[in-house]
Design a protein with these regions (language model features):
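Class I S-adenosyl-L-methionine-dependent methyltransferase catalytic core
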Residues: 1-189
Length: 189
């Protein structure tokens, strides 16, 4: 049994939860260009069929906090001849934005530390005063990218909070963290 309290993959306690923020395509494209050489992510670790940002995703019917993400990926593609690489290297994560967000970030870090995946790029609400920033992100992330302005999430309009990318990468050097900032739209145009 996982040490995490069980949540479905997009953290919904009930239909229509306010924890679900669907990522705008330009944000995903920016992340793909910056951290994945323009390639699509292998796995979206918190999605549903309507908002997935990778060909394979962990949906509402699976507890994303208790499954091995690389194993989930392999099980999803093993019989599909269009996939030639069984490695789940780059994961996209726009976790639920409620109390379970720190649990998803901890899981992302654990997946990288265990060697299951190479990199997890997370889009989160930028709340640098929180415990998760001080205890997990600042001491373990390879990069934090503070996004200029507020994002407009699909179906929700502009967020009432700042956003940032947090990247956990197995290639992190010297236990250092890169801090960057800027717009995401201009970077991909």
């Amino acid at each position: 049994m996982s040490s995490h309290t069980e949540y479905n993959s997009i953290g919904r306690a009930k239909e229509g939860s306010t924890d679900v923020w669907i990522t705008p395509l330009y944000v995903v494209e920016f992340a793909q260009n910056r951290w994945n050489e323009g390639n699509p992510f292998d796995l979206d670790a918190a999605a549903d069929a309507d908002n997935k940002q990778a060909p394979v995703f962990i949906g509402e019917d699976t507890d994303a906090l208790s499954v091995d993400w690389a194993e989930h990926y392999i099980e999803a593609i093993i019989d599909d001849p269009s996939f030639t690489d069984l490695n789940c290297e780059n994961v996209w994560l726009n976790p639920p934005y409620g109390r379970q967000m720190p649990k998803f970030l901890q899981k992302a870090y654990e997946e990288v530390q265990a060697g299951s995946v190479d990199r997890v790029v997370c889009l989160i609400a930028c709340r640098t005063d929180t415990k998760v920033f001080h205890d997990l992100i600042f001491s373990n992330a390879s990069e934090v990218w503070f996004i200029k302005g507020r994002l407009s999430f699909s179906g929700k309009g502009s967020a009432n909070f700042a956003s940032c990318f947090v990247v956990f990468d197995k290639r992190r050097e010297n236990n250092s963290i890169a801090i960057n900032y800027g717009p995401v739209k201009e970077e991909i145009e």
